[in-house]
């Protein structure tokens, strides 16, 4: 025990006053900041978990609640003055001994900034409104329903139900049954999205998850509704990050504000136009991330515990951002489609009323994966390889769905070059006419498209055979320009590789009937092996 600690102990022992809360002597007259910090830390250790102060990336946070549940807030020195009074009786050394007092913001700042206080309070990484599943070393799982010092997670909410695996798979499929996914691979990725927060929050899967980009062909297709369903499974209302074109608050600032709340789910809503955020790209790959907090020290955050979704009908991504994303394409249901109904109302209300069961369904799949040894696929067609190989194995071998990345390459490329849709339609007609593998000129590609009733660029809706020479040249020129843009945006060494086919471009010398020769560009559609 230091001399200062002995001095403080002797003062407290000589005091005959009985205090309802543990006594804490503020610095001054022989009491140093370290002594006060130690006394306060002990007071917080004896308090209820949600009343404690926590160390999050060497910044002090407190747990608060709103209508959406628990969250973290950076503790300001002004607020610390009253927070200290909730767990202790604040004292100072007066002329006649110990006297009750209040803490000034300046004194509070010295305490919460001291390494002694920061190292004495518990660490926290995440606050959730539902239990969190963790992995044991013996390929079993445990579920956290309160504060867990090892993981730094404070979980609240109702415990998850134990759900048999077969029932769990049926529940998750039923949850998605009203969505009109563009392809079977999109459903696999939607199932992966439902599982990912459970896998990464407690680091059962210690890997970075990509941003889940929900693309819709039309308004009201269900992309935003999907984020609400996923949030309901975890008893969370995802923190929303808005993309603003003017005024205060950039998307980077809004992301930092959402991250500091400590809630695991974040939604970037209704992206439009070009998304170019180096800060967000850094967050998706950095091992640690420093989130800026107004009027406080930055908080160091572990990005691997967070799950970000984004919704859009039409947006452009940089190649780096596209590589950090996983795309789920949703089509709008026909007007006459009949959606599921439940005693509680729609599927969202049903999940909220039965949240412990749906979370139990997610946990059942996670437990089965852990029981089987956390196996992964030997290869991955995504830059986030660890996440992709694990979720690909789960959706194939436990959920019995198609491979995770089916159709993903095209969805990814579409955000960089919307002409990819035109190229896929051209491939469909070239293949149907038996011209695959043949070297075709722009005019021959136009003939294939015209036979399939595909509108030709530059033709203004007129069929190819009805165009005059100038119109035909215009169509061929437009097709050539479209191919050039595709190769410029997506090509590597005059090749574009998609899931179903590759497009190869080559220049050849052509001899015409007149005897003249010239260089011409040919395009070959090569089916995938």
Language-model-detected regions and their locations in the chain:
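N-terminal pre-Walker A segment at the start of P-loop NTPase domains
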Residues: 185-200
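Loop/turn-to-beta-strand initiation segments
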Residues: 262-265, 288-290, 303-308
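Conserved AAA+/SF3 P-loop NTPase catalytic/coupling segment centered on the Walker-B
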Residues: 264-285, 314-323
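Post-Walker A helix-loop "phosphate-sensing" segment adjacent to the P-loop in P-loop NTPases
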Residues: 232-243, 287, 490-492
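N-terminal nucleic-acid engagement/recognition segments and initiation subdomains in replication
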Residues: 1-185, 202, 253-254, 258-260, ...
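Phosphate-sensing "switch" segment of ASCE/P-loop ATPases
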Residues: 134, 142-165, 172-174, 302-306, ...
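Conserved catalytic/switch belt of AAA+ P-loop NTPases
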Residues: 276-300
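DNA transaction DNA-binding modules
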Residues: 215-218, 225, 237, 251-256, ...
